């Protein structure tokens, strides 16, 4: 497979992942972190890191809006729930590996 095709496929996979996460607002970021070691914020941070590496100006808010499909504060007020004590404990336990 040539590099151009591979890049196009990877981009399609990324877009599909982001669309899937946008449709699953019931899945909380802390659960993603606890189970998979990454969340929507990680994806947005990686987007910003990639932009920075290419010399593309992008703010943290802009990268989050790309991933969330809306301003982060709006998503948080609509969909984010308070983390339970169990979720917080699992996060603290798994944090040492990040």
Feature map (PLM): residue ranges:
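Domain-level signature for proteins that mediate thiol-based redox and metal-cofactor handling
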Residues: 1-98
């Amino acid at each position: 497979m040539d590099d151009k095709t591979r890049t196009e496929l990877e981009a399609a996979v990324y877009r599909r992942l982001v669309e899937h996460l946008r449709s699953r607002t019931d899945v909380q970021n802390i659960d993603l972190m606890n189970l998979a070691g990454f969340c929507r914020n990680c994806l947005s941070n990686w987007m910003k890191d990639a932009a920075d590496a290419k010399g593309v100006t992008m703010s943290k808010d802009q990268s989050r809006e790309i991933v969330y499909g809306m301003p982060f504060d709006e998503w948080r007020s609509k969909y984010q729930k308070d983390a339970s004590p169990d979720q917080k404990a699992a996060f603290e336990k798994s944090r040492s590996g990040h």
